[in-house]
């Protein structure tokens, strides 16, 4: 067992207890800072320290299971400390503080920190700048404006003078469509940190954001945090809740750290995904606690227009020690993935009563740049997940999703609009109280799934399981306690895969090529 520093910032730091367990340690542990107790009973593998001093050396200690572990670190330097309350903030939860907060953010010198003290600050869209830190003190709440007419509209596409080049400023569900600016906007900047123990509360339930959510009114709905075309971005420690739509939505971001923070949206709030990186590179999602009304983490890469034009995949992703709770899917790939999703490793995550666990969703029409490959899921625990493993290449999204082109079960010509699924590896996974299906792999007949490898996987069904839809595709029967279903897969390797409590035959295969089991 080791104690490691994930990242230090100017006034905060985040650490990880390397114990090989999913999200939580076997027993609570004590955390000290320079010999003084900070947490008496820490119950998560990833933890953070706040209210530190910049440019200062500290020693953090952990007493865990009879072991004493220490880690010495130095916080980042800070040039200036900007107290936003000096800009005339009114912390009554009603007064509009948008211009005052924006003034603090805009005038912060390079290398400085904008500090927001405890209080409830009503605000509309805020825009962060390069080389700055936004620190939300414990008890500080940035409360979103309820009136959509107060929000700026960001055009999806900005044309150039030569009328050839285009700049993509925002998007909606994979297309460059005009949308309202988010509560926090990180646009074309670099080296930005948002940290602290405060809260971003979009307050969407008290507006009209969740009413007729699929209808565009003025512009498409905003995100809680929207980041576009930026580099070296970090979100840490805060709580983000009651989002208008997707909660954290980075597009074309390189080197993105999402560390040890909370996302809370009501389960019935429409399209309130937790984290949706779109065509991003070098992503770390570590120690995040997500409770949402849609997919918890969904890796995306645009729809066919941007995906095939820009060919920007979502790649080099690490997801570790996260709690994924009660969403539609735990870890999801797609369905907007026309640029491709590659090289993702998920470890030590706990999925608790999500509808599906590891979920891949795509369809004809995403394009031949829509390649999913190099996905590894290892050391994951699922509790009460209805369908632990789902790969669905007939996903019925978009206006034509129920049409014959998407849903036809006969082989169609492989062309420039045909997506491809490569290699998926699943190892050392335990899923208890499943309901619909343990494994449901549904590839295209003209472009079968290349390879599925499972090793040391145990799935146990809930004795009181109810039937349901394992994959969102037409003409698929409701299933209950279905062990392994696979259709149109080139290769399946099962090594020490145990399924308990299933009904009927264990294997339901159609058009499966090489199959190996031991």
Predicted features and spans:
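Extracellular/periplasmic carbohydrate-active domains that bind, remodel
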Residues: 1-518
């Amino acid at each position: 067992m080791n104690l490691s520093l994930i990242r230090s910032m100017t006034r905060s730091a985040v650490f990880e207890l390397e114990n090989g367990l999913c999200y939580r340690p076997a027993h609570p542990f004590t955390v000290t800072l320079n010999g003084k107790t900070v947490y008496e009973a820490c119950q998560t593998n990833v933890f953070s320290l706040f209210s530190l001093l910049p440019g200062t050396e500290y020693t953090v200690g952990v007493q865990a299971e009879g072991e004493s572990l220490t880690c010495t670190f130095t916080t980042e330097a800070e040039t200036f400390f900007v107290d936003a309350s000096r800009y005339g903030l009114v912390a009554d939860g009603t007064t509009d503080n948008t211009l005052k907060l924006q003034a603090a953010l805009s005038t912060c010198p390079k290398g400085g920190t904008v500090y927001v003290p405890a209080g409830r600050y009503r605000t509309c869209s805020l825009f962060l700048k390069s080389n700055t830190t936004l620190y939300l003190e414990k008890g500080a709440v940035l409360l979103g404006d309820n009136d959509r007419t107060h929000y700026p509209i960001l055009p999806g596409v900005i044309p150039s003078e030569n009328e050839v080049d285009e700049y993509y400023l925002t998007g909606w569900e994979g297309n460059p469509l005009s949308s309202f600016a988010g509560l926090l906007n990180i646009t074309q900047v670099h080296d930005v940190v948002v940290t602290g123990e405060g809260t971003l509360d979009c307050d969407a339930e008290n507006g009209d954001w969740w009413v007729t959510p699929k209808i565009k009114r003025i512009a498409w709905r905003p995100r809680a945090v929207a980041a576009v075309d930026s580099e070296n971005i970090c979100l840490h420690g805060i709580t983000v809740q009651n989002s208008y739509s997707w909660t954290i939505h980075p597009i074309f971001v390189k080197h993105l750290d999402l560390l040890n923070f909370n996302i809370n949206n009501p389960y019935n709030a429409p399209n309130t995904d937790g984290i949706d990186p779109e065509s991003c590179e070098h992503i770390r999602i570590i120690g995040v606690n997500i409770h949402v009304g849609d997919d918890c983490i969904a890796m995306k890469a645009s729809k066919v227009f941007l995906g095939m034009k820009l060919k920007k995949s979502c790649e080099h992703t690490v997801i570790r020690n996260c709690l994924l709770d009660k969403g539609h899917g735990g870890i999801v790939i797609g369905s907007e993935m026309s640029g491709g999703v590659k090289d993702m490793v998920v470890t030590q995550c706990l999925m608790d009563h999500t509808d599906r666990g590891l979920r891949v969703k795509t369809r004809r029409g995403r394009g031949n740049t829509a390649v999913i490959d190099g996905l590894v899921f290892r050391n994951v625990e699922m509790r009460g997940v209805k369908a632990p493993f789902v790969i669905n290449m007939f996903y019925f999204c978009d206006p034509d999703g129920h049409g014959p082109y998407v849903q036809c079960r006969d082989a169609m010509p492989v062309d420039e609009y045909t997506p491809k699924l490569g290699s998926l590896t699943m190892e050392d996974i335990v899923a208890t109280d499943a309901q619909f299906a343990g494994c449901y792999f549904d590839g295209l007949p003209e472009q079968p799934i290349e390879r599925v490898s499972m090793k040391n996987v145990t799935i146990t069904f809930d004795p009181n399981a109810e039937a349901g839809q394992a994959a969102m595709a037409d003409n698929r029967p409701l299933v209950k306690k279905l062990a392994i279903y696979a259709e149109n897969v080139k290769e399946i390797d099962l090594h020490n895969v145990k399924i308990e409590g299933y009904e009927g035959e264990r294997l339901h295969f159609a058009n499966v090529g090489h199959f190996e089991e031991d």
